[in-house]
Amino acid sequence: MTTIKTSNLGFPRLGRKREWKKAIESYWAKKISKEELDQTLTDLHKENLLLQKYYHLDSIPVGDFSLYDHILDTSLLFNIIPERFQGRTIDDDLLFDIARGNKDHVASALIKWFNTNYHYIVPEWDNVEPKVSRNVLLDRFKYAQSLNVNAHPVIVGPITFVKLSKGGHQTFEEKVKTLLPLYKEVFESLIDAGAEYIQVDEPILVTDDSESYENITREAYDYFEKAGVAKKLVIQTYFERAHLKFLSSLPVGGIGLDFVHDNGYNLKQIEAGDFDKSKTLYAGIIDGRNVWASDIEAKKVLIDKLLAHTNELVIQPSSSLLHVPVSLDDETLDTSVGEGLSFATEKLDELDALRRLFNQNDSVKYDKLKARYERFQNQSFKNLDYDFESVRTSRQSPFAQRIEQQQKRLNLPDLPTTTIGSFPQSREVRKYRADWKNKRITDEAYETFLKNEIARWIKIQEDIGLDVLVHGEFERNDMVEFFGEKLQGFLVTKFGWVQSYGSRAVKPPIIYGDVKWTAPLTVDETVYAQSLTDKPVKGMLTGPVTILNWSFERVDLPRKVVQDQIALAINEEVLALEAAGIKVIQVDEPALREGLPLRSEYHEQYLKDAVLSFKLATSSVRDETQIHTHMCYSQFGQIIHAIHDLDADVISIETSRSHGDLIKDFEDINYDLGIGLGVYDIHSPRIPTKEEITTAINRSLQQIDRSLFWVNPDCGLKTRKEEEVKDALTVLVNAVKAKRQE
């Protein structure tokens, strides 16, 4: 009988009810001691390990669990410490300061992890002295052993780690070579401690320019072979297809491939004989990035095909389960949709069902999952017809004409100031919202509280001297979840949390049916805020691309169709705001760049679809209505022309953590629309200085026409404390006032 093994690439850190987040934030707030934090996180790590053991995984990952980010863990492991933080003991407090900044130093850059909604802390190579300095990975491996867990260590590989880092005078190849002896030292320590194999994550090898890394990749793994450790290494790739013939030629013990998000290419390579059968194939057959239950019968067929071309097969999720919630156990969902879902724990159950079927000829669990999937598929969630053709996809007039009408209507000063949208969600705000959702207070009591909070912050903004105000979004838990709760076709879970960055957790809605706008979503709060001031108040919406990218999308319709359905719904809300007298409407697209496919052959169509959806949502307004949008920082060079094609009157972009890198993207384009490049980092509690903001403005004005430039923070201010926000915005406005006098 042919046998298979099961494994996992990583498990969610958050805990079922965000225990991880709550403990870390309590430590930051000095509500618990370091000893209490360590105990809570140790208990949670233990729970994760034993849960995976319960589902009979043959090997369980360690090194995926972290206090903030696994890339930052690797930086500290190799003493890659930002120059401004050097000279301190390498401990958890240093880790938190690098990630969040402190009163003296800015945080390291925060960038999307490939095309996911997870963010990593960018390693900085300026004036570093790499060495093995904090081998937490070894400690966690030994801890798993103490629990009698058959664990394998996980570490990001040298090619990926260096490619995702910045700074330093060495070339890419030189940095990799610098790290090789250090990786060897870590590998040897783990093997000596009993590791049967080590998972080396190299997702950079599925990207477009992976072929340019092949020489240094071969040199690196040849080095590990000469050191006697290569056969203990398993190179894991995910999120796209890999160059299998090249990977198979490397002297490692196993290769991991994604058979879900590869568009079928990896199986074709296997069937073409590109896989070296002397190695173990780690097949990512269960979707690690979406929440839908697997077609378990199709997975059985895939395993049969793979077994025909391999001698040793391990099945696993397509990527780390970091990207999905922990468990469905605490949810109370409608059966019609709930039967079609599978979170991290349920995905382990799917692996176990396939293991039992192939190894023990036990089909009980397999048959149960198969019947459940078939019941879900027999339902119809395609019920609506859409008239996409009747909605405008371009503004009535060019920007040069629109801006004249908008300026006449708004009468804004030189270098207008604004914020991105949200203000602090205090404990009181969260309590009122929770009490209202759980029917512990009346609608009237909740509405009164919201109005009081809106009025208070309108006055704060006026007192500070901002030019374009916002209502603060106190009614919203999350910028996507809020719309998921109000639009038809979405399901919002109770505990479906996933990690975005650090302790920031989001609860992505699940798109299961046709999307439709049925009633105003934001009009009441925005109109009320506008009634309190003579200054313009922005309507605040989330764009169709971001709603789709930050949701768990349905897989029974083409992505473009779902995206355009959302665009039509947002268009209805835009028009409702305009009809209510709102002069400035912001439609945020922070996730437009992150959804860009990893392979350039798919870029043009993705960007074309994204631009069309945004314009479908925003083009029906009159010329005098000003459309804003916002995007989070990433490598914008690839999409700068698409950003221009959105034809938004004003775009604000998160830039401060890039330390000026993003400004370079504007050197090759004459950006002739309104733009605000964020002048301070909202992810850090640190208050910027007037000089820092002035420097950021001056740097931006080297590339941006002053008449088009806006001044704003990097992003929404929801996660900051009230006093931090007031102090930082006061500094911002004072810097702008001084600049206007020049």
Swiss-Prot record:
Which SUPFAM superfamilies has this protein been placed in?
Answer: UROD/MetE-like
Give the function comment from the record. Catalyzes the transfer of a methyl group from 5-methyltetrahydrofolate to homocysteine resulting in methionine formation.
Q: What is this protein called?
A: 5-methyltetrahydropteroyltriglutamate--homocysteine methyltransferase
Q: Provide the binding site for Zn(2+).
A: H630, C632, E654, C715
Q: List the catalytic residues.
A: H683 (proton donor)
Q: Name the source organism.
A: Staphylococcus aureus (strain NCTC 8325 / PS 47)
Binding positions (5-methyltetrahydropteroyltri-L-glutamate): R18, E19, W20, K21, K112, W550, E594
- Pfam families reported for this sequence: Meth_synt_1, Meth_synt_2
Could you tell me what the cofactor note in this record states? Binds 1 zinc ion per subunit.
